[in-house]
Amino acid sequence: MRSRDMERGRKHRGDTQWTAWLTPTIVVANVSIFIVVMYTNDCPKTTTGANGDCVAKLLRRFSFQPLRENPFLGPSSSTLEKLGALDWKKVVQGNEKWRLITAMWLHAGIIHLVMNMFDVIIFGIRLEQQFGFIRIGLIYLISGFGGSILSALFLQKSISVGASGALLGLMGAMLSELLTNWTIYKSKLCALLSFLFIIAINLAIGLLPWVDNFAHIGGLLTGFCLGFILLMQPQSGWEEFRNSSQYGARARSKYNPCQYVLFFVAAVLVVAGLTVGLVMLFDGENGNKHCKWCHRLDCYPTSKWSC
């Protein structure tokens, strides 16, 4: 999305712009963790050659697994599992709840990492500059957590990694921020269509094999709700009223009734959704038993691939 499509159309001046340091820190952390993962993986030492040779052998122990094993140019699934990938059996039966958090800091390969971090920079910096690191950090972490819960409920026979849930949470928060702060935007329809298009593209990519679309959906829904809670802004005209020196000027509410309703409904939904999801997960529930067609949301079979 171009920056001009995301610009705020405020009718007053003097908006505070925060310095974005958390988003670059998140990117550095993800890249650093990936380097540690590749060092631990040590393809030349652990690969037997049954699936082919290591890729980029010049990197030695940092070289990638054979493409037949990992087309994203990354480590083996066993290395990811050892270092904190989301694995239903280990989370529920092994009591390793921390995997619901650690999985969002791991990536399947350098392609996966670059794509996610590029989007995190685009969306994260813009949001952090406008709303500060605390609110954006909360949205990122809680959305990633929500994505992990939904993924673990539906994908119980495979492992999952990636910041996609947290990233989609940022996108969802941007969408709800547009809706709840509708009166202070210029080019409302253009911005709305741009958000919906980008989100649709990401969800469509999630229909491909090897991509965890349940993490996408869980993160998106969580972030969408959190946007109504954490990113609510004063309605158009309130700032002018507050700064007005006119005696007897009619009082104006800081937020409009619709914003309060959205705040309350979103708060109930996010608390209830995360609570119910955790209860179902640790009760050993399989989401596919309650939704027979939901597996199609993660991978849609075509003549080009099977699921």
UniProtKB/Swiss-Prot annotation:
Catalytic activity, EC = 3.4.21.105
Q: Name one GO molecular function term.
A: serine-type endopeptidase activity
Q: Which InterPro entries match?
A: Peptidase_S54_rhomboid-like, Peptidase_S54_rhomboid_dom, Rhomboid-like_sf
Q: Which reaction does it catalyse?
A: Cleaves type-1 transmembrane domains using a catalytic dyad composed of serine and histidine that are contributed by different transmembrane domains
Q: What class of enzyme is it?
A: hydrolase
What is the membrane topology here? Multi-pass membrane protein
Q: Where is it predominantly found?
A: mitochondrion
- Give TM regions: 105-125, 136-156, 159-179, 191-211, 214-234, 262-282
Organism domain of life: Eukaryota
Transit peptide, start-end: 1-62
Keyword Mitochondrion applies:
yes
Q: Which GO terms describe its biological process?
A: proteolysis
Residues of the active site are 164 (nucleophile), 216 (charge relay system)
What's this protein's family per the entry? Belongs to the peptidase S54 family.
Task: Briefly state the protein's biological role.
Answer: Probable rhomboid-type serine protease that catalyzes intramembrane proteolysis. Might be involved in response to abiotic stimuli.
Q: What protein name is recorded for this chain?
A: RHOMBOID-like protein 6, mitochondrial
Gene name of the encoded protein:
RBL6
